[in-house]
UniProtKB/Swiss-Prot annotation:
SUPFAM superfamilies, per the entry: Calcium ATPase, transduction domain A, Calcium ATPase, transmembrane domain M, HAD-like
Extracellular side: 82-93, 265-273, 666-670, 731-751, 806-813
SMART domains in alphabetical order: Cation_ATPase_N
Phosphothreonine modifications at: 881, 948
Protein name: ATPase 5, plasma membrane-type
Alphabetical list of NCBIfam families matching this protein: ATPase-IIIA_H, ATPase_P-type
Membrane topology type: Multi-pass membrane protein
Residue numbers annotated as active site: 329 (4-aspartylphosphate intermediate)
Predominant localisation class: membrane
Name of one Pfam family that matches: Hydrolase
């Protein structure tokens, strides 16, 4: 393969030499390479991808010990070995080794878990590897772009990301978006023999090309090392920083108070004071927090993949959990995208033409390979798909693009005459044919008739090309006919939309079809018919009642929009974001990319173009809306795990810092830093399992509310600190436990008090996770077996230490099984109010605690279906009101809507509109018959024999 070394060394300018010389230099033809030749060239040029920087495993491992939380622990280790060297005692080697072990254990667990999650994520992303059509062994096949080599012939079509630097072969000019490479905002025209760059996007046209450079030798590859790889600090990282700073500030406050009291006022010994400071530093820092949250998110992304959603950006999970508006395409998402044509409804407008000829012309204007849904439906109506090209010679095919919205074929018939056939959007075909006003009115009447039945219209036209040239304008176009296309809704779409509304996600239909079709589809799916034409987005709607409504409010309250172009999608997302909505947007085409990138969660649907996938945050591998709603539920469960852990981490910091601070200052009892290390190690081992814990998703959109996290953490942590102080006071200054439980007093046994205090802190600290992980009573929501097992094992270890340990260096001596039983009982009794505190702080923070109390909407109930009765009553009232059985509901002085957030109002309004639409279905003959049958108790089979519905 030495003859190709000059290509690899780039000693030949393949961009400027004539195309004939390109083939000579690359030793190839327009028929492409053979598989063997391509394999040899792959060995010479390497894979068509950029070299990945391999991160050192050692540096990655050490990176887990290089963050603000780890720095605090490292300062504590230095204090144990340096500052603790005083008071006639040697350096605190045990604590130093313990802290280092804690850091190593945490880093090891984090390294293993994140490495596994990273491998899983890499495997998922491999499924999104760009693919391309390549000609090898004289056959076209779809292959991964990484196997391309110079000399390969590839096919480029609308929406493709160019896989390698290439020169265009014969064909029509392309429109190429090079903005990601050159910064040009307007697509540039590329003619045959021009070069196209790897990474640019085909915006219009279709052509074949020969690859001239791959991998690091491409224009993109050479520029890659110049790209600034500085990582932006995302919202998730800011949240972690805020929580970490809160914990560090809490510890700093405790340390300052201890320093001000212990040395100037109490005149404590230097070494004892250092030990107390170490307790706060070691016990208060949630050292495992960054790893737990990152691993939870990575593990969650794998679960999403199993449900048919690949996350390209991990932080999209938290945004998906907070999504309250979903703008979704009708075709393929709400419907099956399996079109059928009703031959009986075909309208013919050309004289002397039958319906079969309309079908034939439409089939000729369709592809017979690489078909889209419309092409497949049209060609499939023929008795034999080969009829589409029978007796004619194809000269040129004009592919579909979002601007022209039509396809066309130039062909020569058996008599040598040249013709063109075109099919496409009726409005585009009408303009093409330059139809008179009366014809337009007739066509629009047929279109409206189709639309009322939920049918899309496809216009067909023909033209004679007297010049007999493929680029000739030809004679006048003639409108031939209209075809009705029906795309049935998915069987699960209606139920999925209802689920979405109940989850607080307002689903808006975005369709390029007519308004009447959008309304009919919305009616069938029960999502409401409050839909508007795309002109309403620009304030051009003629309806005076809508004209007075601000565009932002119109978009917010609409159930959908029809006649939408890609630029309208961008405007919808932009306006919704201005109204503080977290907006999801689905898309599949190259022109959807700006809206997908603008949306908080860009979702590329199944079979989306490379450009749409590149701009999206989540790529679906399964069709339908149900995949998205399942992903929302999974994301909320993942987010709940992360939020619950952060509340737990803040609570533990408050509980350790203030609990031990008060004990140290009031009773001058010096808790052992080594025992705090044991608590921290056991805690981290247990908490690492939270990423796999079973979790109920939030019933409403959720997001990081730091005020709620800090408030809940302070209340729960403060309560636990108080219970520890009370326990120590009763144990040291009274005989309560010995009098009532028969255990020996410990007031004069500080080593055994250390053991008892250690066990009490360990049990109640770890048990707190069961409170923070549940939305209702903690005992009613069963945790995962892994979390439960880890808790049991950790507390068995803690109990055995408290009962049997005799470690002089840690100043601890076993307190016996009697005290262990007392401590477990005390911990159980003090655990019960934690749920009540959780409910209390939640209702106080919601701002409607008094209203909830008056209307009995509290969590202090054993009912499983919370709020079910009220929803059923609202449903019954809506039915009675609709049928005139009772007047419309009057406002209550405690109007629920006035107290709910605006987002909940919008979801509720959409839900009610959907309910009304479904209830209108009752006013049909079938609904009336079934109602009478139920009322009279008649035989339904007998009734159905006499009524045809």
């Amino acid at each position: 393969m030495s003859e190709l070394d000059h290509i690899k060394n780039e000693s030949v300018d393949l961009v400027r030499i004539p195309m004939e010389e390109v083939f000579e230099e690359l030793k190839c033809t327009k028929q492409g390479l053979t598989a063997n030749e391509a394999s040899h060239r792959l060995d010479v040029f390497g894979p068509n991808k950029l070299e990945e920087k391999k991160e050192s495993k050692l540096l990655k491992f050490l990176g887990f010990m290089w963050n603000p939380l780890s720095w605090v622990m490292e300062v504590a280790a230095l204090m144990a070995i340096a500052l603790a060297n005083g008071g006639g005692r040697p350096p605190d080697w045990q604590d130093f080794v313990g802290i280092v072990c804690l850091l190593l254990i945490n880093s090891t667990i984090s390294f293993i878990e994140e490495n596994n999650a990273g491998n899983a994520a890499a495997a998922l992303m491999a499924g999104l590897a760009p693919k391309t059509k390549v000609l090898r062994d004289n056959q076209w096949s779809e292959q991964e772009a990484s196997i391309l080599v110079p000399g390969d012939v590839i096919s480029i079509k609308l929406g493709d990301i160019i896989p390698a630097d290439a020169r265009l072969l014969d064909g029509d000019p392309l429109k190429i978006d090079q903005s990601s490479l050159t910064g040009e905002s307007i697509p540039v025209t590329k003619n045959p023999s021009d070069e196209v760059f790897s990474g640019s996007i085909c915006k219009q046209g279709e052509i074949e090309a020969i690859v001239i450079a791959t991998g690091v030798h491409t224009f993109f590859g050479k520029a890659a090392h110049l790209v600034d790889n500085t990582n932006q600090i995302g919202h998730f990282q800011k949240v972690l920083t805020s929580i970490g700073n809160f914990c560090i500030c809490s510890i700093a406050l405790g340390i300052i108070v201890e320093l001000l009291v212990m040395y100037p006022i109490q005149r404590r010994r230097y070494r004892d004071g250092i030990d107390n400071l170490l307790v706060l530093l070691i016990g208060g820092i949630p050292i495992a927090m960054p790893s737990v949250l990152s691993v939870t998110m990575a593990t969650g992304s794998h679960r999403l993949f199993q449900q048919g959603a690949i996350t390209k950006r991990m932080t999209a999970i938290e945004e998906m959990a907070g999504m309250d508006v979903l703008c979704c395409d009708k075709t393929g998402t709400l419907t099956l995208n399996k079109l059928t044509v009703d031959k009986n409804l075909v309208e013919v407008f050309a004289k002397g033409v039958g319906k079969e000829h309309v079908f034939l012309l439409a089939a000729r204007a369709s592809r017979i390979e690489n078909q889209d849904a419309i092409d497949a439906a049209i060609v499939g109506m023929l008795a034999d798909p080969k009829e589409a090209r029978a007796g004619v010679r194809e000269v040129h095919f004009f592919p579909f693009n979002p601007v022209d919205k039509r396809t066309a074929l130039t062909y020569v018939d058996s008599d040598g005459n040249w013709h063109r056939a075109s099919k496409g959007a009726p409005e585009q075909i009408l303009n093409l044919c330059n139809c008179k006003e009366d014809v337009r009115r007739k066509v629009h009447g047929v279109i409206d008739k189709f639309a009322e039945r939920g049918l899309r219209s496809l216009a067909v036209a023909r033209q004679e090309v007297l010049e007999k040239k493929k680029d000739a304008p030809g004679g006048p176009w003639q409108l031939v006919g209209l075809l009705p296309l029906f795309d049935p809704p998915r069987h699960d779409s209606a139920e999925t939309i209802r689920r979405a509304l109940n989850l607080g996600v307002n689903v808006k239909m975005i369709t390029g079809d007519q308004l009447a079709i959008g309304k009919e589809t919305g009616r069938r799916l029960g999502m409401g018919t409050n839909m508007y034409p795309s002109s309403a987005l620009l304030g051009q709607v003629k309806d005076s009642s809508l004209g007075a409504l601000p565009v932002d409010e119109l978009i917010e309250k609409a159930d959908g929009f029809a006649g939408v172009f890609p630029e309208h999608k961008y405007e919808i997302v932009h306006r919704l974001q201005q109204r503080n909505h977290i907006c999801g947007m689905t898309g599949d085409g190259v022109n959807d990319a700006p809206a997908l990138k603008k949306a908080d969660i860009g979702i590329a649907v199944v079979d989306a173009t490379d450009a749409a996938r590149g701009a999206s945050d989540i790529v679906l591998t399964e069709p339908g809306l149900s995949v998205i709603i399942s992903a929302v539920l999974t994301s909320r469960a993942i987010f709940q795990r992360m939020k619950n852990y952060t509340i737990y981490a803040v609570s533990i910091t408050i509980r350790i810092v203030f609990g031990f601070m008060f004990i140290a200052l009031i009773w001058q009892f010096d808790f052992s830093p080594f025992m705090v290390l044991i608590i921290a190690i056991l805690n981290d081992g247990t908490i690492m399992t939270i990423s796999k814990d079973r979790m109920k998703p939030s019933p409403q959109p959720d997001s990081w509310k730091l005020r709620d996290i800090f408030s809940t953490g302070v209340v729960l942590g403060g309560y636990q600190a108080l219970m520890t102080v009370v326990f120590f006071w009763v144990m040291k200054d009274s005989d309560f436990f010995s009098n009532y439980f028969g255990v020996r007093p410990l007031s004069q046994r500080p080593e055994q008090m250390m053991a008892a205090l250690y066990l009490q802190v360990s049990i109640i600290s770890q048990a707190l996770i069961f409170v923070t992980r549940s939305r209702s009573w903690s005992y009613a929501e069963c945790p995962g077996l892994l979390l439960l097992g880890a808790f049991v094992i950790a507390q068995l270890v803690a109990t055995f230490i408290a009962v049997y340990a005799n470690w002089s260096f840690a100043r601890i001596e076993g307190a016996g099984w009697g005290w262990a039983g007392v401590i477990w009982l005390y911990s159980f009794l003090t655990y019960i109010p934690l749920d009540l505190l959780k409910f209390g702080i939640r209702y106080v923070l919601s701002g409607k605690a008094w209203l909830n109390l008056l209307e009995n909407k509290t969590a202090f109930t054993t009912k499983k279906d919370y709020g079910k009765e009220e929803r059923e009553a609202q449903w019954a009232a809506a039915q009675r009101t609709l049928h005139g059985l009772q007047p419309a509901e009057k406002n209550n002085i405690f109007n629920e809507k006035n107290s709910y957030s605006e987002l909940s109002q919008i979801a509720e309004q959409a839900k009610r509109r959907a309910e009304v639409v479904r209830l209108r279905e009752i006013n049909t003959l079938k609904g009336h018959v079934e109602s009478v049958v139920k009322l009279k108790g008649l035989d339904i089979d007998t009734i159905q024999q006499h009524y045809t519905v």
